[in-house]
Regions:
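ATP-binding glycine-rich loop module of kinase domains
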Residues: 1-24
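Active-site beta-strand termini and strand-to-loop segments that position acidic
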Residues: 1-2, 56-57, 104
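Protein kinase-like catalytic core scaffold
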Residues: 4, 39, 53, 109-112
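Conserved protein kinase catalytic core
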Residues: 13, 62, 118-120
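The N-lobe alphaC helix and its flanking beta3-alphaC-beta4 segment of protein kinase-like domains
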Residues: 18-36
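Conserved structural core of kinase catalytic domains
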Residues: 19-20, 38-77
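Conserved kinase catalytic-core segment
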Residues: 73-101, 106
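C-lobe/activation-segment region of protein kinase-like
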Residues: 88-94, 104-154
Length: 154
């Protein structure tokens, strides 16, 4: 059988952002990403009532895990830049944070379906690249999300 991921939409209060209909946004973003030629997992099913999405599971480490564990993401940068170029050509930004990218068989997959209208400030070159190696930003994120101790993959 095929392994899948079940994503349950949750609603958290957020002062600075209005999400609108999140399940419809998920479907719309999936179509926009496919149209832009971004490598994403297949959406297998969507249940608008239960606000659930079933998508293909992409096995492999995230780019974040690789960097955290001492590996380099260098070999994946050309693919990330190609995705960024495709997204920009379609008028989109994707979330370039390295937890959203899984490496499998030499390819990276964008495993989140989130995308937004393109803004240069949030492009890969201006924002995302800052987290694709052991930069001060990456180290600050690690420290902030691990209580100062080494983060574990579990």
């Amino acid at each position: 059988g095929k392994q899948v991921v079940l994503k349950q939409i949750h609603h958290e209060p957020c002062d600075y952002y209005s999400f609108g209909n999140k399940i419809e946004a998920e479907r719309r973003d999936y179509e926009r990403l496919r149209g832009a030629g971004i490598r994403i997992p297949e959406m297998i099913a969507i249940d608008t009532e239960a606000e659930q999405v079933v998508k293909e599971y992409i096995e492999g480490p995230t780019i974040f895990e690789m960097i955290r564990d001492g590996a380099s993401a260098e070999t994946y940068l050309p693919q990330a830049r190609e995705m960024a170029d495709r997204a920009k050509a379609a008028g989109l930004n994707i979330d370039y944070f390295p937890t959203n990218f899984v490496a499998r068989d030499g390819l990276i997959w964008y495993v989140d379906y989130e995308c937004n209208d393109y803004m240069d400030e949030w492009s890969f070159g201006n924002w995302g690249i800052r987290y694709w190696s052991r930069t001060p930003e990456f180290e600050a994120y690690l420290k902030e999300h691990s209580g100062g101790k080494q983060e574990s993959a579990e």
